[in-house]
UniProtKB/Swiss-Prot annotation:
The gene is obg. This is GTPase Obg. SUPFAM superfamilies: Obg GTP-binding protein N-terminal domain, P-loop containing nucleoside triphosphate hydrolases. The lineage of its organism: Bacteria, Pseudomonadati, Pseudomonadota, Gammaproteobacteria, Alteromonadales. Its cofactor is Mg(2+). Monomer. It comes from Shewanella frigidimarina (strain NCIMB 400). Mg(2+) binds at S173, T193. It is found in: Cytoplasm.
Length: 388
């Protein structure tokens, strides 16, 4: 199945049903009073995380989604039926962004988690609601409020513990194949990897972590060179980064220059992402003699002024990959557990929150005197006796 990590959709919540103006009319009860029911609430639109999905491809072809409208109220105090909510299934790790305000509506990081993206309209009030001692036969009602309409951008961010960084042909896909059962395409030309890949690494029985491989970066990616930086978003949730450097590039480019270019593109995209823990890993050591390897590493580390962790491996021969996997596992397990921050709901005033109270006050202040003069409140409990 094609991997799609972005989609634009339009969601429309259902409108609220309108209230009803009706009066009780039965045999022997000519002035029964108001009995118009309220309308039903409009259906809302939700996003729900589903662990069985791994792509947003369905939303590339179906872009418009609408919840059900609430039905209108009826006589005899019949309330309208509320509209059914619309629940859209998305992969775990999906982020919803309002395209008009560029506001992040929320992230779905747990299976089954739901996110409200468009609230349904509130129901209208029937004329029974406006009954009072001075307005005993009201002919007022309110309309249901319209449901929210939003244009939303869906972004799928992969959930992984370790993210791989590096130039094209640095050996990232070969590394993920050597330490996991993932099978990304490997070839001797740049940009073999066109979409992100995930692999589960099991260095010890019962202990594992997830590693993410993204397409390679080149200088100028922030301006759109190569495949651009659109795939860097998949590293935002990684707990550490593995910067893989080709120690003996076939094109003769200095590894120092390549490493600085990667860091520069990372900082342009997100300083927060650039500040994540990062290890340097020199790959393709099988192409050099042992004495050449250390000399070259010392020179690169010195020119980069690197103070962090440094490792060597040959992903093709699987030399050093197992030891590196164990060290990554130990480091990840030493990090504090991720705790989901639960923030208090913001006190947001929706446009319909005070709508009905205002309409009620306005109706009672400016009511029409057009009502039945002989109306009797006791008619609600009247006992009807049928005689021949």
């Amino acid at each position: 199945m094609k991997f799609v990590d972005e989609a634009n959709i339009r969601v429309e919540a259902g409108d609220g049903g309108s209230g009803c103006v009706s009066f009780r009319r039965e045999k022997y009860v000519p002035d029964g009073g108001p009995d118009g029911g309220d309308g039903g609430d409009g259906g809302s639109v939700y996003l729900q995380a589903n662990e069985n999905l791994n792509t947003l491809i369905d939303y590339r072809f179906t872009r418009f989604h609408m919840a059900e409208r609430g039905t209108n109220g009826r006589g005899r105090d019949c309330t309208g039926h509320g509209g059914s909510d619309l629940v859209l299934q998305v992969p775990v790790g999906t982020r919803a962004i309002d395209q008009e305000t560029e506001e992040s509506l929320g992230d779905l990081t747990v299976n089954g988690q739901k996110l409200l993206v468009a609230k349904g309209g509130f129901h209208g009030l029937g004329n029974t609601r406006f009954k009072s001692s001075t307005n005993r036969a009201p002919r007022q009602k309110t309309l249901g409020t319209p449901g929210e309409v939003r244009s939303i951008k869906l972004e799928l961010l992969l959930l992984a513990d370790v993210g791989l960084l590096g130039m094209p042909n640095a050996g990232k896909s070969t590394f993920i194949r050597s330490v996991s059962r993932a099978t990304p395409k490997v070839a001797d030309y740049p940009f073999t990897t066109l979409v992100p890949n995930l692999g589960v690494v099991n260095p010890r029985p019962g202990q594992s972590f997830v590693i993410a491989d993204i397409p390679g970066l080149i200088e100028g990616a922030a301006e759109g060179a190569g495949l651009g930086i659109r795939f860097l978003k998949h590293l935002e949730r990684c707990r550490m980064l593995l910067h893989i450097i080709d120690i003996e590039p076939i094109d003769g480019v200095d590894p120092v220059y390549s490493a600085r270019a990667i860091v520069g593109e990372l900082e342009k995209y997100s300083p927060k992402l650039a500040a994540k823990p990062r290890w340097l890993v020199f790959n393709k050591t099988d192409l050099l003699l042992d004495e050449e390897i250390q000399a070259k590493i010392d020179r690169i580390v010195k020119e980069l002024d690197w103070q962090g962790d440094v490792y060597t491996m040959s992903a093709y021969n699987r030399t050093g990959t197992e030891e590196l996997s164990i060290k990554m596992l130990d480091y990840i397990r030493s990090l504090p557990a991720i705790v989901e921050e639960i923030t208090a709901d913001a006190d947001v005033e929706f446009k319909w929150d005070n709508y009905h109270s205002a309409e009620d006050e306005n109706a009672n202040e400016n009511y029409d005197d057009d009502f039945d003069e002989d109306f009797d409140d006791d008619d609600y409990d009247v006992e009807v006796i049928y005689q021949r």
